[in-house]
Each structure stands twice: as C-alpha cells, then as structure tokens.
C-alpha cells in the first residue's frame, strides 16, 4: 500500500470512530514535552477498542489463529457491546496468552521463527499501540523509516538516494546486525528513546 493511501485509510478509520482528534492532541502534547497520565482511559475507551478491531480485521493475519484457536471471525459474531466489555475486562489484569510459534521461509532458503499471538492479545496490543503511537511519533526522527506507520524501505531508499545525489556521495554501506531485535538490551533502548 502506498504511503498516501495508508495515511488516508488510517485517518478515515480514526475519524469514523471519533478518535483522530484525541490522537492529534496526544501528538501535539507529546511534541510540546507534556507528561501523560490517565492513558488507560483512552486505551480502554469503547471507540478505541472498536478502531483496534477494525485495524486488526484489515490484516491478513487476523484469519490465523493463535494458541487459543480463535480468529477475528469468532469475535465478529459478538455484539459490539459484549465485545467492548470483553476487551475492557482484559485491561484490568492483562496477561497475554502463549504465542503460537511457526517457521516461515526466508528468501535465502533458511527458516525464520514467527510468533502468532491470540486474537484477543492482538486487539489489546492494538488498543495500546493506537494511543502510544502518536506520543512516540512526535519524538521520533523524521527520517527514521523502519517499522513506522505508512513508511517503507522504498521511502528510506528514496531519501538516501536524494542525499547521495545532493552531496555527491559514491558509496553505500549495507549493515545487518544478525538477530539485533532479539538481542538488543531493551532497558538501554528505552533510555535512548526517552
């Protein structure tokens, strides 16, 4: 999906569930250095939960069951009110279920482990992501492209190519730290972020 379409779809969904003004406010407050309290009120708000369902439902993986055997379809048959209450209940004492482990092939023929969370865990985590994302995005470097909303490797390549052309650079170094994400010290990483 192109970044313009991605942005348009995300905005349309957030506006439909009346969450966009909240997200814009979180972004602006974070940009100005605000310290946040009471985020659980926003995270567990019915409209944020409904938006999380909509966003997860749009993922191909929503039809793949975790260790509990449930998919998005098993939640879609519930009444909206019952579904919202089920997710809100999770926030009182949230403990994620075990993650289903599968191996998927990499382009080089080797296998890569993939974890598939239970669908309820995906919804809960999406609720948290939707609220934390505007807060964090306000602090991130504008030209950081990895694992960011509506950004891609193509965006990074385009930016790097422009820099190389403008500055008459002739060399590119490709660095891939094997297993970086699995081995990074998260305490140090969090200190760097905040």
Task: Enumerate the predicted regions with their spans.
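Conserved catalytic palm subdomain of right-hand nucleotidyl-transferase polymerases, strongest
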Residues: 62-71, 115, 154-193
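N-terminal alpha-helical targeting/anchoring segments
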Residues: 8-78
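Short, conserved non-catalytic motifs in the polymerase core
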Residues: 60-75, 97-123, 139-152, 173-174
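Short, small-residue-biased leader/transition segments that mark boundaries at the very start
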Residues: 1-7
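Duplex nucleic acid-engaging cores and interfaces of nucleic-acid transaction enzymes
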Residues: 18, 35, 115, 119-129, ...
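Reverse-transcriptase-like RNA-dependent polymerase core
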Residues: 56, 86-110, 123-131, 158-167
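Generic, well-ordered alpha-helical scaffold segments in large soluble proteins
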Residues: 22-25, 29, 55, 59, ...
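A short, contiguous, amphipathic alpha-helix enriched in charged residues
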Residues: 74-89, 193-194
